[in-house]
């Protein structure tokens, strides 16, 4: 059995696409390839170029493949659905354009849950309506990921 190990821009401290502290996306690709990796995750949508005609050749010239992407958005918050949907659509488009097979959905940190992080017995729980909305938003993006 062969195990393939890739990397991700978060290894370079990239958590948000427009953070001025981020290294250049080309630096991330260069150093990832130099370290011997052959696969990389997309990082936050907007960090790497969204134009496949720019990112594709950059990956290919370094013998790298885009292997997946993460949507880190406020799935718990119906007021932020448009932002969540936008980030999800853009991520799925990039994954499809480059043949990546892995889509990871992560609910962002909330002011409500942060104070009890790591202590589930103390955490305030979603009510039935909140839970149903959360699940439906996740399902919507999961379907998009399988259909794109």
What are these regions (language model features)?
Residues 117-123:
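Intrinsically disordered, low-complexity Ser/Thr- and acidic-rich flexible linkers and loops
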Residues 111-117:
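Short acidic/His/Gly/Ser-rich catalytic and metal-binding motifs that mark active-site loops
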Residues 1-102, 123-147:
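N-terminal pre-domain/capping segments
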Residues 59, 106-111:
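Short glycine-enriched loops at secondary-structure junctions
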């Amino acid at each position: 059995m062969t195990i393939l190990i890739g990397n991700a821009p978060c290894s370079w401290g990239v958590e948000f696409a427009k953070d001025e502290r981020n290294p250049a996306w080309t630096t991330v690709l260069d150093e990832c390839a130099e370290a011997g990796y052959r696969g990389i995750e997309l990082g936050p949508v907007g960090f790497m170029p969204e134009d496949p005609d720019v990112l594709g050749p950059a990956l290919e010239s370094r013998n790298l493949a885009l292997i997946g992407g993460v949507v880190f958005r406020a799935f718990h918050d119906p007021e932020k659905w448009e932002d969540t949907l936008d980030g999800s659509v853009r991520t799925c488009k990039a994954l499809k354009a480059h043949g990546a097979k892995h889509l990871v959905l992560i609910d962002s940190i909330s002011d409500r849950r942060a104070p009890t992080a790591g202590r589930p017995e103390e955490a305030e729980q979603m009510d039935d309506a909140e839970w149903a909305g959360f699940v439906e938003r996740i399902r919507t993006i999961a379907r998009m990921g399988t259909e794109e």
